[in-house]
């Protein structure tokens, strides 16, 4: 029998872990949990409705490349399902979110929008089946 693979976590890196964690808490009501990495250094974890996100610090002196220009290869974004796109977008805008793509229908039954999060992370909001 082949192995079974399940999603476990997403791991982000940030120059300002506290600010990044607070963003996810403010925008998406994520719970912030202080943690320790396997190497003993501090890490901040988030619980976003069962989605685990680790945020590890990038030292201020570390050189980091700029965000890639499109097209590029690698992780593009992560997606969050919402029951009501209009309600979610209105609430996120009220909380100060910046949208790179306003809600639009991409095919029958699927509507998307994109939020720009700290550290060049793009978050897709998806509403399925209401349209």
What is the predicted function of each stretch?
Residues 15, 128:
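Cofactor-binding loop segments of dinucleotide-utilizing enzymes, especially the Rossmann-like FAD-
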Residues 1-6, 31-79, 90-116, 129-131:
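Vicinal oxygen chelate
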Residues 20-25, 92, 120:
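Conserved active-site tyrosine of GNAT-family acetyltransferases
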